A protein has these predicted regions:
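Extracellular/periplasm-exposed beta-strand and loop segments of Gram-negative cell-envelope proteins
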Residues: 57-77, 105-143, 170-214, 241-258
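Repeated loop/turn-to-beta-strand initiation elements of outer-membrane beta-barrel proteins
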Residues: 93-96, 158-161, 227-233
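Outer-membrane beta-barrel strand-turn architecture
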Residues: 88-92, 153-157, 225-227, 267
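Hydrophobic, lipid-facing positions within transmembrane beta-strands of outer-membrane proteins
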Residues: 45-47, 78-84, 145-149, 215-219, ...
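Transmembrane beta-barrel strands of outer-membrane/channel proteins
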Residues: 49-55, 98-104, 163-169, 233-237, ...
């Protein structure tokens, strides 16, 4: 009995020793982390994370004459974004932020068009290219890795504004849809006519023609609600065509314009 009791006491002592060691290491790690944050703060560095959602669209500017009317628009599902960033403050007002962001940019639209460049996939899997007059439904679901580099200006203790360029890399892509209630003239507006009426539709998919690298401008504002929590809004405006240079089915350039809204945490 004494031997068993002694073994139990030894186990308890070992457990207590392990717990004390873990607690000590955790406390040391926390202290080092706090010291690192304090050092960064004293040297003008600030780190943060953001999480939000995006709403907007991919559109030509201005709307070309081929697009006669926008019949409907929807965000195209939940489009989330996650970002980590570092800010260097040069003085009490001015600073610069570099970030890395994963962002979804979606939309779904329906439009009435006339002589709109189109390459459709017919029922037997073949392609027909020409000019479409009628209804067009477009679905865009793209995911990007984005690197913004923006200048910051503190308007007050709680408010700051930012502006600067960004570059992005396309990770997942989808630009597709279908045409309905209209006709296709091939190869041009004086060519043979193919009609689609009632439930007859034809699909298209331009996903493989999307450009991998894009760039643009970002303009934003941020309000610090609490010591570490803030609310932000960033508008991103693409400045180069989303399609590759050799893609000529659609005769005009299209640009991604999205508003990203969410919450951030400053360490």
């Amino acid at each position: 009995m004494r031997r068993l009791k002694k073994q139990e006491n030894e186990k308890i002592c070992h457990i207590i020793a392990v717990l004390l060691l873990v607690s000590t290491l955790s406390a040391q790690a926390q202290e080092e982390r706090n010291q690192g944050i304090i050092w960064s703060y004293l040297h003008g560095w600030e780190y943060g994370i953001k999480a939000g959602f995006s709403i907007g669209g991919t559109s030509p500017l201005p709307l070309p004459e081929e697009i006669r009317k926008i019949d409907s628009y929807a965000p195209g599902g939940l489009a989330i974004s996650i970002e980590g960033n570092a800010t260097k403050w040069f003085d009490t007002k001015w600073g610069m932020t570099v970030g890395v962001r994963l962002e979804n940019k979606n939309m779904t639209t329906e439009a009435t068009v006339k002589n709109y460049g189109m390459k459709i996939i017919n029922t037997n899997g073949g392609e027909l290219q020409g000019l479409w007059t009628g209804g067009v439904k477009t679905k865009v679901k793209n995911s990007y890795l984005i690197i913004p580099v923006v200048a910051n200006y503190k308007v007050s203790k709680r408010w700051k504004v930012s502006a600067g360029p960004y570059v992005s890399y396309l990770i997942e892509r989808n630009f597709s849809g279908h045409v309905y209630e209209g006709h296709l003239r091939t190869p041009d507006q004086t060519g043979s006519r193919v009609d689609f009426t009632g439930e007859s539709i034809a699909t298209y998919d331009f996903s493989d023609n999307l450009r991998k690298f894009q760039w643009g401008l970002q303009l934003g504002g941020e309000w610090r609600a609490f010591k570490h929590l803030n609310v932000y809004a960033d508008l991103t405006w693409g400045l180069n065509d989303i399609f590759k240079k050799d893609f000529d089915t659609i005769s005009f350039a299209m640009y991604p314009i999205y508003l990203n809204v969410g919450f951030g945490y400053a360490f």
